[in-house]
Amino acid sequence: MTESVDKLAEEFLHIASHLRLAILLDLHKTKTNLSTLSKKLDTTSSEIHRNLTRLTDANLIQRDSTGNYSLTTYGNMVCANIQSWEFFLLNSKYFSKHTFGNLENNFIQSIGSLHDSKHVQGFINTQDIWKKIYKNSKQYIYNILFEVSYDSETIEIIKSQIKKGIIINSVFSKKAIISEKRKTAVDDLDIKTAIKNQQLSRKISDDVQVLVVLNENEGCVMFPKSDGDVDVSEAFYGTTKSFHDWCLAYFQSCWTKSGSFYEEKMKK
């Protein structure tokens, strides 16, 4: 145990330098050579060379025959974890009042996928993001929801997308907060037809804590408060592939585990 801890501490020393960390993160974007790194990081070539040598000796980076440096498999793994730390540190104030809820370990371990995102604050602003995602959809809309809005603008967007053939899949919490306008919405002919044709599909989950709304290119995710309450007043919105892939994988996992939808389960 002591030996492994000592080895781990030694590995952390390799990235405990601002310059070495900057080199790693730059190489995580693209391979490059010594002179380019020197210009980018505004550091002498000799200092860059010294740190490149240390990172190479630590098996974090490698040099090819053309003189370009790139990350090793180990280096890529380290950078992936650095992104997780970065996401958490940049949003430390948010996470002082929020948790990861019931996220499985694989989603927590890949939380760095969300690092390139925008922190949206305010209930109205998060609702605007949802509507934006709905409007921008060209293929599908996927939701994991606790509070379900049936305001006229949202319903019109949904109906418009249904007419375009957009697939809509939603996981609702068994304890979902439902608007009194729900009955009118589900009785709408376009929506009833979409449900019948399975263009609009729904499932029920006993334990919804982390929420997502996404289309094929963008998404947003909302984490619960420290007391366990779902919070839709703040969200993280992103358009990168890594952000979207994380949201999609999480939705698919929840969709697979959720049960069949029955209208009588949805109480006002």
Give a label for each model feature:
Residues 1-25, 36, 41, 46-47, ...:
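PLD/PLD-like phosphodiesterase catalytic module centered on the HKD motif
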Residues 71, 143, 221-222:
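Short hydrophobic/aromatic-rich beta-strand segments that constitute the beta-sheet cores
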